[in-house]
């Protein structure tokens, strides 16, 4: 009952929940004091190997690779670029097939 009252009072005062956890585990700790304390393991941070300094470039030069220059093509009208005309059929040049009489 006292723990509940302490939690309500502490919540009203605006204390963090981490403080509550510390208080509640501190009261249960004497019962578990017979267990061996856990070893603290220090983890080593992995450091990346230093790369040689690259030549500094403009930001656009890094991202955009220029294509090989093509020889200049003769300028055409816009319609001529888009529409390819099919070869015109000349019907008049051929004599009409006459039915066999």
UniProtKB/Swiss-Prot annotation:
Gene Ontology annotations for the cellular component aspect, listed alphabetically: periplasmic space
Keyword GTP-binding: no
Pfam family for this entry, one: Asr
Subcellular localization, as worded in the UniProt entry: Periplasm
Post-translation changes: Proteolytic processing gives rise to the active protein.
Signal peptide (from-to): 1-21
Propeptide cleavage-removed residue intervals: 22-59
Ranges for region Disordered: 26-101
Compositionally biased spans, kind Basic residues: 40-50, 60-69, 79-88
Role this protein plays: Required for growth and/or survival at acidic conditions.
Similarity comment: Belongs to the Asr family.
Name of protein: Acid shock protein
Organism of this sequence: Enterobacter cloacae
Upper taxonomic lineage: Bacteria, Pseudomonadati, Pseudomonadota, Gammaproteobacteria, Enterobacterales
Gene name in the database record: asr
């Amino acid at each position: 009952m006292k723990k509940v009252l302490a939690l309500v009072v502490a919540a009203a005062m605006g204390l963090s929940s981490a403080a509550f956890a510390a208080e509640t585990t501190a009261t249960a700790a004497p019962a578990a004091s017979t267990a061996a304390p856990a070893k603290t393991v220090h983890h080593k941070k992995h450091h990346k190997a230093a790369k040689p300094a690259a030549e500094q470039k403009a930001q656009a030069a890094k991202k955009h690779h220029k294509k090989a220059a093509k020889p200049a093509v003769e300028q055409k009208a816009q319609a001529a670029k888009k529409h390819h005309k099919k070869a015109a059929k000349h019907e008049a040049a051929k004599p009409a097939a006459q039915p066999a009489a």
